[in-house]
């Protein structure tokens, strides 16, 4: 392995590791702040965490899960074997299709948020603290978050394919603020 490749590998590894560590620290601070500022005596903390489960599930599927894992090798193949215009067309079609799917899921999610809450947390139905209503309201607000986080993850996959690792590694830290 050439010294240039070793340096590039080391630089990219340190960049991604550093930004991942920063992201984890920001995530810890965020979770601590949530715990401190949302008293669980009213059940608000439980409602908050339930409302975040569904968008985070979609984030794992569309953002950081199967889609990104499948997309990077396909895009890399296009990048290495096709003309620049074909690659750009593939990227445009991919983003357009994903945007359409995420908009549909977001709109449906906003409309059926209370039903989803009662399916995931049936104990909220007769809660003395109206946790179901609070969680449903929070979930309605979180579906647009799901749209943006999933789209951001696909854009990060594109950047990774083009050997740009700093911005995709830093993005989770910004989203934890």
Q: PLM features: residue spans?
A:
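Membrane-embedded alpha-helical bundles of multi-pass transporters/translocases
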Residues: 1-177
